[in-house]
Amino acid sequence: INVRNFKAALEELGFSETYEVALGADIGAIAEAHHYVNKVTTGELPFLLTSCCPAWVKFITDQYQEFIPNLSTCRSPQGMMSAVIKEYFRDPEHAAGKKTIMVSVMPCTAKKAEAVRPNSYTHGEKDTDIVITTTELIRMIDNFGLDFATLDPEACDMPFGFGSGGGVIFGVTGGVTEAVLRRLNPDHSKETMNEIAECGVRGEEGIKEFTVPYK
């Protein structure tokens, strides 16, 4: 089961278009890489903390306020993607007379809280209108009696139906850091990308130390 199967199921459920949130992760990786260069390499900050997880951001802001300046100012992939899509469909030519309702499918309930935060609004309107968890989506699919085996897989819709490998690995342990490191490194050859992947950034150890090539 992959995103193409879910695209087919979502269409049966009545969703008009389905996009790939990995693109939002790509935008976030680019933004965090710029933030790192502007703040950490200049010496303004000693380190940078990712802001892609709303539960993590709330933990820092509630329990460790001294680290708030070290939090990236970037939105999460959900926030990035929703803002881009809503802005795209503000163009009357793209909207084609229809109102855009942005529904985000996410694995974590913290994304529901993120969607109603003031910084998740643009022009006074919510960027993400509704958030459903992956568990809730599976229940919807079951309740509608849909069977993945009988659905023809479909590609996500354009122009936002794609994402790079860096965006896809956001969901694994160490993936955000690796995606940012890929963006920071000017050499994007397969050899260098493999070196970054194998440097120790991935894994479930509590504290990880590693060096990466910069060519």
Report residues per predicted region.
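Iron-sulfur-associated redox domains of electron-transfer enzymes in respiratory
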Residues: 1-215
